[in-house]
């Protein structure tokens, strides 16, 4: 933005682990990603200040235009492809953004450019085969098919063809609504000033009408 790249879109990306509780020992052993997943991405996007600092600088909704969700099997597939094609064996959590970019590239014009940055450490996770062996020992079904039928904690479905790798777009308005709800809860707010409204507009990258509508739903008085 500061460099004047106002036409550039910023995408976030996570592996879909919907339904698995991050604090559950049983669920923990049924997920093949301990980072780079929705169990971190969604809570920290909608409530950035619940981390171990008074005010977090990582405020994703200020900048993120879209949030792409990919499946476990898709990331394992891209991890193996990267290993075979480029000789780079890492991840799989460190290939989350690359998988989302691969899916996104299928939607864009051929002259458009995607810059991929893995915010997770690129060696995140054990060797893919070790992780898959452990998953199988925990009763997770491993198979090839439609990765969109992947159910976290139940199966891992690898695509039969790379064209099957398609990212899902998370509902950004839902994230932003949750952010405002959490911000209100943090300070037990019953009223909001013009400065508060301006702050929430900047935090959610939304217009005044959206912020006022959500605050009204939460019974917050504007003063």
Question: Predicted segment positions?
Answer:
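Flexible loop/turn segments at secondary-structure boundaries
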Residues: 18-22, 98-99, 122-126
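Buried hydrophobic packing segments
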Residues: 1, 79, 97-105
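Active-site/ligand-binding loops adjacent to catalytic centers
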Residues: 3-89, 131-217
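Flexible, glycine/charged-enriched surface loops at secondary-structure junctions
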Residues: 86-97, 110-113
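Conserved, well-ordered active-site substructure
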Residues: 113-116, 126-132
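Short beta-strand segments
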Residues: 11-14, 115-119
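Glycine-rich phosphate/diphosphate-binding loops that line cofactor/substrate pockets in enzymes
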Residues: 104-112, 188-192
